[in-house]
């Protein structure tokens, strides 16, 4: 299963809202767009239009990762995921695993400590070791769902990333190491961080295009 950056954001929002605001789930296009563009709990912050979100939904529908639902007497179409833990899903996740994957989809690579701090509305992790155990379980699967990135110089913890939106891991690790160079100024580090994010998205989109060509 490979997701583009926009697809990862949409799936992440649907997973999050299903848990945190079940009374509002499934989501309308308007609600889903607002969730994708939230200024908090999202990295990077996006500014997607409804048409961009709709195009993403259409792509996810073709991948059978979402379904539409129309309410009785309502013309508003709402969307729910088929990403995991449904009768149509091959992927089954425990609540702890779901929380970690959701956060990685919404906020990119994170340390176990960051995941524990940010997961309080999704799952109650008692301590960081419980998060680490969950990450290990996700990594030890027959088809790993997360990977450990190279530790950045000067950082106490290494970060993990999800493997649904695939990137060149060696490229990311090399650029991540550059971020901690003692000679780099704050402005240079910021520019490198932006470059890493851009390259991740470009590689993911190129792989999606290649897969589409191979399938045709």
From Swiss-Prot:
A Pfam family this chain is assigned to: DUF480
Record's signal peptide: none
InterPro entries: DUF480, WH-like_DNA-bd_sf, WH_DNA-bd_sf
Cystine connections: none
Protein family membership: Belongs to the UPF0502 family.
Classification via PANTHER family: UPF0502 PROTEIN YCEH
Entries under HAMAP family matching the protein: UPF0502
Name assigned to this protein: UPF0502 protein Spea_2482
Organism field: Shewanella pealeana (strain ATCC 700345 / ANG-SQ1)
């Amino acid at each position: 299963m490979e997701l583009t950056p926009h697809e990862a954001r949409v799936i992440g929002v649907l997973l999050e809202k299903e848990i945190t605001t079940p009374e509002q789930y499934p989501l309308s296009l308007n609600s889903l767009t607002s969730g994708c563009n939230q200024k908090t709990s999202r990295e990077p912050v996006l500014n997607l239009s409804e048409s961009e979100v709709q195009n993403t939904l259409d792509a996810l529908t073709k991948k059978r990762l979402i379904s539409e639902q129309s309410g009785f007497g309502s013309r508003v179409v709402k969307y729910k995921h088929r990403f995991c833990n449904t009768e149509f899903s091959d992927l089954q996740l425990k609540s702890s695993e779901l929380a970690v994957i959701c956060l990685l989809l919404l906020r990119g690579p994170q340390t176990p400590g960051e995941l524990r701090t940010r997961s309080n509305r999704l799952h109650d992790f008692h301590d960081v070791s419980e998060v680490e155990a969950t990450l290990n379980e996700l990594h030890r699967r027959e088809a790993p769902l997360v990977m450990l990135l190279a530790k950045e110089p000067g950082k106490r913890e290494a970060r993990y990333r999800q493997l649904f939106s695939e990137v060149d891991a060696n490229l990311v690790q090399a650029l991540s190491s550059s971020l901690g160079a003692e000679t780099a100024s704050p402005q240079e580090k910021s520019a490198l961080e932006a470059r890493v994010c851009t390259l991740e998205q470009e590689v993911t989109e190129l792989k999606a295009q290649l897969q589409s060509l191979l399938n045709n």
